[in-house]
Amino acid sequence: MKFLLDANVLVAWGWKDHSDHAPVVRWIARERGRPGTSFLSSPIPGLGFVRVSVQRSAGQISVADAADVLAGMFAALGNRHEFLPDNQPAKGFPPWCRLAAQTTDAHLRQLADSHGAKLATLDHAIPGAFVVPVG
């Protein structure tokens, strides 16, 4: 299975003080142990991680440091990590995408689908996405 990690999964994984850090770490470890599992990244979730990391109230971090943290997370996945260039146009949204807040989710879901992957998220409101179990 291939999983495109969205920004909220990356933030939970990257910061120990995040309420979903432990279950996301367990899920990644469990999936890493399964043959054929890979974790995908793309520019939008990566930028989301950097933006949220810099804005966190739990600690100040620079843009460069946040990018380094993210690079370290992907390096920890070794050959289980693959970067997906994002060549999807900003059009052709699915019928469930009706609000501005849904456009990025819809785009990432389509990007994952186009690469035979599942969008891995903590958001229960994205049709067809894989919701990482946290509870």
Residue ranges and their predicted role:
Residues L10, A125-I126:
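Catalytic metal-binding/acid-base residues of hydrolase active sites
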Residues A12-G14, V52, A129:
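Residues that scaffold the ATP/ADP-binding catalytic core of kinase and kinase-like folds
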